[in-house]
Amino acid sequence: MNFIEIACLCAAIFINIALIQHTIAVFREKRNKLLELFNNRPILPARKIRKKRKKRQFWIRPGRTPLWWENLKNNIAVIEEWQENFRMSQPTFKKLCEELRPYLTKKETNMRKPLDVETQIAITLYYLADEGRYRKVANAFGVARCTVSRTVRRVCKAISTKLGPFYIRLPSTPQQVEELVSGYLRFHGFPQCIGAVDGTHVQIIQPNENYTDYLNRKGKYSINVQGLCDYKYCFTDVVVKWPGAVHDARKKCVRI
């Protein structure tokens, strides 16, 4: 390669770098304008926009019945509805109930009978499998919307704190690492690989504080979630802490 060819190559590289820098500058300018627009938008405190709470009239609204859930639980409905509504088979659902039973069983009081473990888990799975509508879940299981909210939070906390560390964990021994490496090479053709890393955005409601940190590149408020999977498509690590405005390139592979 002579001097002229080297000079042309260097010039082409400099031109490409200049184009990339220009593109980044344009993107930053658009982003700054968007952030400025949202920063100037007035936001009322949550206590001002919160509606006055109405006095409770019923434990459960008249007309709400758990008939659909009772039919499904008693095997009267079509068995395929388990997979369609809960994203798992009936045997898997029963196994999940047994593992969470020590943490979700409630004591009976003089007021009314508490929700059993099966109903609590069914409410949570139905909520997570759909678009997350409290009213729809409440109508399907014959409970109040506030009951759906408390149940979903309680079950999710039990799953993440009690079952999460057991099922979602990184390899801790050389034998486990070797098994992952050989599995990726055998089934997917990737050498020296123990996991596939990617991220996704989970949309959230606009926070009252530091809301611009959660505004992603699509103009929606979200949490940036990073996941690591093995060759069997099972999660081995999940990191849920990055606000939506953080770019994927800035996230470090935590604990990897």
Named regions from a protein language model:
Residues 1-107, 161-164:
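Charged, often Cys/His-bearing segments associated with DNA-binding zinc-finger transcription factors
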Residues 2-5, 133-256:
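Short, well-ordered secondary-structure "scaffold" segments embedded in the functional core
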Residues 30, 68, 78, 82, ...:
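Alpha-helical interaction elements in eukaryotic regulators
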Residues 89, 123, 137:
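Short alpha-helical segments in extracytoplasmic peptidoglycan/chitin-binding modules
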Residues 101, 128-133:
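Short connector loops/turns at beta-strand edges and beta->alpha or beta->beta junctions
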Residues 107-115:
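Short, surface-exposed loop/turn segments at secondary-structure junctions
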Residues 117-130:
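Short, amphipathic alpha-helical "recognition" segments used to contact nucleic acids or chromatin
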